[in-house]
Amino acid sequence: KDPKKAAMWCEKAAEQGIAVAQNSIGYCYDTGFGVEKDTSKAVFWYRKAAEQGNVGAQYKLGKCYYYGKGTEKDNEEAVKWFRKAAEQGDADAQNRFGYCYEYGEGVAKDLAKAVEWYRKAAEQGYDVAQYNLGTCYANGMGVAKDIAKAEEWFRKAAEQGVDMAQYNLGVCYGHGYGVAQNRAEEVKWYRKAAEQGYADAQHNLGYCYANGMGVTKDYAKAAEWYRKSAEQGCAEAQYTLAELYANGYGVAQNKEE
């Protein structure tokens, strides 16, 4: 394994106009693989490849413009390249293009178009787009509100490990949104998100333990999860943890803490 030689030969091929090599050497400069990191050189090579239709380079060039990395930040230019990659079927770009439509970044805000592009990426199995599409259905954004479809897309994303989707699927089970209420399933999905560090899920899991919902009541475990959430700044968890300390539930009583 010799990153320097890999980069050297890649650059030679790039200089001869090979698009895939231009994309690869751009990535080398972007990440410092085998060369000294230089984001402006990354942009130079991504552009060369993107102009030849290389879909990966089009997406990465869009990201450079979006974040102002190696070039001036320019949302309109970012959208131009996201669109090109999205139209070639790149799921990353389709999701990002949808996001730009949802928030009106570099393009006029259009929730229906956001849904259209999220759906294209989601149907390719792109996890974050599945979550985004679920959120659109849950809130009636760009599409008729449909809790059952929201639950369906949250589940797809949750099963791929998206913490926000796992949390929302837990909420669906807790309230019977689009699915039969099931406290054990609620806890299962909160736990998955909580173990990934998602603060709202940590709070809700603590609540389930404190109230014996879907699990055996256990104030010590409730306090453990409330603390994790509180340490991330969740105000509700901070207040509830204070109450647990004040009353000695699951923790040694400590009115000062």
What would you call each of these model-derived segments?
Residues 4, 8, 21, 59, ...:
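Alpha-helical tetratricopeptide repeat
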Residues 8, 18-20, 25, 55, ...:
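Short hydrophobic transmembrane-like helices used for membrane targeting/insertion
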Residues 24-31, 35, 60-67, 96-103, ...:
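Hydrophobic face of amphipathic alpha-helices that form TPR/SEL1-like repeat modules
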